[in-house]
Structure formats: structure tokens, C-alpha cells
Amino acid sequence: MRFANGQTGNTRQILHSEASNNLGGVLLQMFAESEEAVLEFLSQRPIQTVAMAGFIRDNGMVSRHNRGTFYGYWNSKQELEGVALIGHATLFEARSVAAVKAFATLAKKWNDIHLIMAEQSSVREFLHYYSDGGQSVRHSHQQILFETGRSPRQHGEVHYLRRATVNDLHLILPVHAEMCRAESGVDPLASDSSGFRRRYARRLKQNRTYVWVEGGELKFKADVISHTPEATYLEGIWINPNISGTGKALLCLSHVVGRLLNRSQSICLLTNVTNGNAVRLYEKAGFSSQGIFESVFLAPRANALN
């Protein structure tokens, strides 16, 4: 079997099929030969899919750094209708109900999914098919997808803003771990200390984190999670409470955005709809809402703990 983008399939590779429902859909694991077609598919909605596209550009289609496996769903016309990364963080972009159902059905076979994240309507459709046999939901957050393509006004210099290095790890790691715990309910320093430290050190070596450190104290940080020519995805933005209300957080963020726009068409990020302070900060920095995402955190299966 050969698909329109050059991906080949055989009986061993076909993981899920809707042929019995006359939909003719086929779900296949993705390999390096599909990279160009997948990136083209994802680029049709660049800010919604920047995380997956960035992982592929950074790590390739198959890599332990992805912490999961990429799959593609083809319809009966051999057209790609969906791409998913299924694993620790499960992300997907689907253009049909059949693709969502295929991804959700396959995801039930995983024991260690920590997060499911996509646009809210897609996540709820995914959970409809996943709930019978999947891991239980720990909790979820609705998030605003913010985006800007304009460099914000920068009133003042920020000579103190710089790229973080591994020498900053001891300052950043506890802060980032607490952010993860507050968001997911899991403290990564308790559940996977060495892995968490190793992954964040890799990010620092990739020059993906901006910081302001003064007097041995972290004042501000922002992480570049994914980068493509079309979009850059920011996450992990943290502001020391002792600079709140000074305008310096806005100044730091504005300079980060300005620098990143030199190599990407737009900057995007997610923030919880209930985080009023963050929403106001991003709006002041020139970001505007492009939709609602949902992040669903799952509890581990009971048998995975034994």
C-alpha cells in the first residue's frame, strides 16, 4: 500500500482501520520518509500545531526526545487527515472525526499518558472515544491560545535579560518544577528528578530559555518550547512576585518577543482562562486570542503503579 505522500503501509503497520464502517481510514506510525508531508500538513495551521512541528524539526520523526510516537491518519482517498504524537504528552491535529477516533482508540493502549492537549472541541471529542478503557482524568484546564506577529513597544533597555546557561539550572529548576506541579498536580522533582533535570539541561544547552537573574535570584524566565519559520511557542513564563507591578515583566516579555520575531513570523503561547494577571500581561504585550485549547492531565493506571 502506498499513500499520496510516499508513506508505505503493510499489514504489520496498519494499526487501526475504519474500513468496516465504509470510511476506509488507515492509521500508520510515521517515520523519516513522511517528515516533509507531515510538516506541510501541520503548516496549514502553524500556531495550533507548532509544538508537534517543533519536535519534528528538533528531533526528527522518531526520537526518544519526543517521549512518544508520531502517527498519521489517511482517508480512503489516501489523503492525510490527521497527525498525532501519542505518549507522555499527547498532541494531535485532526481534520475529521474518524481521525480523532483512530487516535483515541490507539491511545488507550498506552499506560503512561500524562497530558492530552489540543483545541478544546477536539479534546472533548477525543475523550468521548478514549474514556471507555483509557486512563482516568485527574483534572483539566481551559487555556487561551494567544498570538502576536508584531514586535511590541519596548520602553527601556533590558541589559539584564539574557539566554540561560546550565550554570543557571539550580535557580531555574525548582521554579519550573513548582510551575509543573501547580499545573498538573505532579511534582517532577519527586516523580522523575533525574529525567526532569536532564531534559531541562538539554533545553538550556539549546539556548531556549531567557532569564533575568540579579543578586543570585531569578526574576524572570521564559522558555522557547518549539520553533518553526511560521511560529515560535513560548511556555513556562515566570515572574518573581517582587517585580510585580514594576513594569519590568512586560519589558522582559516584550524584548523576548521582539528577538524571536527576527526569525519567526509569529509568537504564540497558552495561558489558563482563569489567570487574569497573565491574560492582562499578554494583552499589554500585543497578544490576541486565537481560540481555546484544553489541557487534560491523566492519572496513571493502577496496574502501571505495581
Give short role names for the model-derived ranges:
Residues 111-119, 231, 260-271:
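Conserved GNAT acetyl-CoA-binding A-motif
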Residues 23-30, 40, 46, 53-115, ...:
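Conserved donor-binding loop and adjoining core beta-sheet/short helix segment
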Residues 97-106, 235-241, 245-261, 279-284:
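Conserved acetyl-CoA-binding loop-helix of GNAT-fold acetyltransferases
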Residues 117-123, 241, 269-280, 295-305:
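Conserved beta-strand-loop-alpha-helix junction that forms the acyl-donor binding cleft
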Residues 3-52, 151-189, 306:
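Short amphipathic alpha-helix that is part of the acyltransferase structural core
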Residues 121-139, 250, 274-291:
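Conserved active-site alpha-helix within GNAT-family acetyltransferase domains
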Residues 2-17, 75-79, 87-159, 296:
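Acyl-donor-binding surface of acyltransferase catalytic domains
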Residues 57, 86-87, 188-237:
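A conserved beta-strand-loop-helix scaffold within acyl/acetyltransferase catalytic domains
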